[in-house]
Amino acid sequence: FDYPDAREAVLYTSATDQQNHAVIADYNPLTTMLKSLGQSLGQVLNANLSGASALKGIDGRLTTPFGAESPIHLSQCGTWGDPGTVDSGWIFFQPEACIKRLLNNPSGPEKLLAARASWLGYRGTTIGPYSTLSQLTGLDHRTLLPPYLPAGRGEDLLFGIMLRRLHPESAVLNEGWAVPHYPVDNRSSRGTLSPVNVNASMMMLADWLECAPRDEAGIPPEARLIMLADEIARLSQMTEDSLEGIVQQELLSKRAGLLARCMDHLDALSELDILPGTTHWQTFLQQSRDSLVGQIQSQDPHPVADALTRGASDLETLRRRGFDFAEAIKAWPEICQAARTFELK
């Protein structure tokens, strides 16, 4: 049992170096990905654990959201190759063991990150509450799921949060193996460790929806989907000042959380002082700390308007898209029902 931010990464100097470390499985990944969908957590644990003693040492808080009957609606796996991120900021969220491996490589952190050759995932089968939509994902479409056609940055995380809202009792099964992810474009320019900062983006919507209202308890998924859509519709109808105020609060919370993580990384530097990449990593952390503190101290009074200006958009366009998204979510069950009638010819 664990959370998405507990995934580990191993970085390689090149795609060739990575391939030399590959262990090719002799089973069909599609069949393996689908085998647990629709099963209960109890059934999955019986199939994957040698006995109750296998749970020894697990943090009980990780199991609190689940019960023996918790269904598996989604399964996913690790990534082998490009991590799929727009920059190298993802390494900031890795556990200390991964950071240590990164800094211990004589190539240097940025050169290693620029190779875009990594394994990212769990070391074995892992149960968690949230999904991130991996390169190969299993979906149990026999039950109502939120729309799952992510095209933009952050929409995979938005799907995971919406799935949790619809089925708070469900569990996500993470396989311990990975599938290749080799983009067609050259992404070697994405190795730079730029200071961590937070601005208004799609993730603000995901963060807002993550906080489920207390009156959702015991409500069926169909009604929960409508409640989700109504939340988004209400956001699209807010006055500009009210919307800016909400986003300001979300940004402050997110920046404070990232600053705390940055300070934890800085505190851990004493254990990394003899590694080749420690100085570079320390500079990155100090710049990130200063950037986050600066954003917290000089809070932008109009984060939404500024984000829209950078994106060459405006508030009315955002409102219209929000309303259209809400209406599309409400229509999603009908779309799924119509899809059942499709036939391949």
What is the predicted function of each stretch?
Residues D2-G81:
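Conserved donor-nucleotide/metal-binding helix-loop-beta segment in metal-dependent transferases, i.e.
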Residues K56-D59, T63-Q135, R142-L144, L166-K345:
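Terminal low-complexity segments of carbohydrate-biosynthetic enzymes
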Residues P147-P150:
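Active-site rim elements
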Residues R153-L158:
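Acidic donor-binding loop at a coil-to-helix junction in glycosyltransferase catalytic cores
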Residues I161-R164:
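C-terminal structured domains
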